[in-house]
């Protein structure tokens, strides 16, 4: 049997060899040969309603599974519509392979119809990108793309394929082991540094483990828990790291940073040792950098050497895969335990008592009202039915922060959100990808009325594939986070933030063939959530919440993380 194939068929064969089961995309003229082969159904294609959402859905697939997500777009506007999703996955280190069509090779550079310099445009927002010149070059490019996307620090890779490459023919030769000269990463970590770090952990009197998304990417949640329990250290998880340590774990404090808890931020301020694992000391965590953790030494473990020392100098830098480093580190920590465990027992106990006191002094307490639905009330109801086990894909804004504060996650890969880029419109298509990847799992799309209206066409995708998504719109009639800043820092001059028009949820969902309802009574919230969960298919809930609620605690721009605004200003008697 001849292995002479068209480029389009070679591409599908490569996807099958990479164990790609499904992809998200939107066809166009130059990708027609590829879609003709996809018609055979060996790789399931999900048709979205906008290319940006194809990339977000691929991210949701990847974030919830750890596998590479795949998206596809045609040339020109199709490819440029992917850019926001590529930047989003780049900033959050999500493995995505984007396939784009391109005009025929002879027309490149001629301003042909639907031509764009996709290769040039995406150089800054991908780990790597390819422009394939011949059908015979496809196997190497595709397999290298998957290898680069998933290895080292994960990220997006784009493969740009001209139409004549799709239509051309070549003998398909499977690619063996990928070896890329110049592309190197050090997964193991330096043994001497690991031993120094283990010793420093036992020496510390007020340690804190700072776990980021890198712990989840590395599949190191179990090893993180082992370390936390062995050294009996309090721990925090970043917005991207939530679920790396179960929310129910007695050593877990909460999320730190701009909208983190009082206890987490105070712990950072007074700690004498930060054990940073797969976290990058982002500005949303540190606040004013010069004032961050002034008494702390730092152990920093990250697969990407660029991140170590970029924002906060590390006393013990360890370049390596978090899982492999923790495997070794846990052995050394356990080896040192008999001689070291008792040296700071009293100080460690006092440290944990101090953190417990901070947690009791200013707990994350939801607002409650009989007159209107408080946003935290809605979030708590989602938490009640999820029980720490459901996937929640959040959009960007106040609802995202309340979700991070009040929803429990007992496992990694349950909390999906656009952390670094903060892309509004992310929540719904990401939930689509997560639901497709996890058909037996309960998935919530937690969105605001602003972000939801950016991705509203994807209701058609949800209906088309009868995805049992539970879409919860936290509708406060505003771009809530922007309004909060205008209220607090711009003398309440509310400029261009009112979202006065919102479609009738029942009619909107009904137009797509599934149920929806609007909830305005606080007493109805729990029942509405229960009804949505019991329904076997998709369900849209439009929950009208208090329009002027703010997310607290809040660290103002330029402030240290212990300079928190803990609640609304108290009225002054005159």
Where are these regions (language model features)?
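Phosphate/pyrophosphate-binding active-site segments
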Residues: 1-2, 136, 174, 295-396, ...
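Active-site diphosphate/adenylate-binding microenvironment
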Residues: 11-12, 16, 20, 26, ...
